[in-house]
Amino acid sequence: MRFVLAGYGSRGDVEPFAAVGKELLRRGHDVCMAVAPNMLGFVESAGLAGVAFGPDSSRLLDEEHVRNRKMQNPISVMVEGMDHLTRLWAEWRTTLTALADGADLVLTGLPEQRFAANVAEYRGIPLAVLDFFPNQHWHPGALGRLIEQMAKETEDAQRRELGLSEATGASTSLEIQAYEQLCFPGLAAESAEHGELRPVRPFVGALTLELPTDADDEVLSWIAAGTAPIYFGFGSAMRVETDVTVATISTACAQLGERALICSGLSDFGHIPHSGHVKVVREVKHAAVFAACRAVVHHGGAGTTAAGMRAGIPTLILWLPVADQPIWAAVVERLKVGFGREFSTTTAESLTADLRMILAPEYAARARKVATQMTKPAESVASAADLLEETARRGR
């Protein structure tokens, strides 16, 4: 069978699609992925055929960019957002319509769902969606509502271009919940209450490629030579103020007598001097390194949050007011395996206090207990692939 997978965003947004795509490819299917141009190399490195669409996504969650947007006139922000989305949606429609010709199923994410649904209807094939958090837990502000209206107008125009009648409701066959059910108790029962009014929404757990990095062996050797460190990472799309960030981390860990492992990601920490209790690398394999750490501090991406929970260590989420990051901060707090704070309010003093709290034995004990309830990565990928195969066969 032929599967078209399309996801726009950073590595954290794209990797779940690549993980299930790689499994489908292993099973003998034809798989093609549509991603932002800056993610094309990543997809191809995983052995998948890729097609680029839309503008570069690397700056969308950049901390400086987000901070500057908050300081701008709302009109300027709106114009910038409209320009970006107009370009993205136009390329998205053209690219996906072409790729879906001859496909058996289209898999996409929540932001692209409405446009993908039109393409799937036009091609007469089923549509599946990957959800990284419950979409009913996300409440857009005024700008988000304006964008929603823009999207609806664009969707209507797309349907007219494709010769489709006016949409009457959701046309998704399958919505895979790529996170753990335990993170949102009651959600499965809520979906069941709606019965046939909603698509199938199975929980499979987080989807990851678990790719090794060049730094893994070096980092594990450094960890083995001393006490277990605290991991600090900021995701694949976030740049931070390097000098201030390293100084804040170094000061807090020194006060607590802890070592710090900092993964710089897109930020350049190489020129910044740091103390002997701090090690800086670009990236590590979470599955290999997290279990050797005392705790994990990160931005609150769905994938990193799941990796920390699977490793059975406490979590501190320093979130930006974008996407699902505040949602995952609330999850670790509710499960009592961590704490959340907005990144912009973090100081050396607050970081010291927050780390002291989550390093308490009771947090570690609860984190270990939650880890036993998490789905294994290989099982998550296999379950997602099974669901997609079954949906594609039914749609033939």
Spell out what each predicted region is.
Residues 348-396:
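C-terminal amphipathic helix plus adjacent low-complexity
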Residues 125-186, 191-199:
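Active-site-proximal region of nucleotide-activated glycan assembly enzymes
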Residues 85-152, 182:
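Conserved nucleotide-sugar donor-interacting segment of glycosyltransferase catalytic cores
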Residues 182-295:
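Donor-nucleotide binding loops and adjacent catalytic segments primarily
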Residues 105-108, 281-329:
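A donor-sugar binding/catalytic signature common to diverse glycosyltransferases
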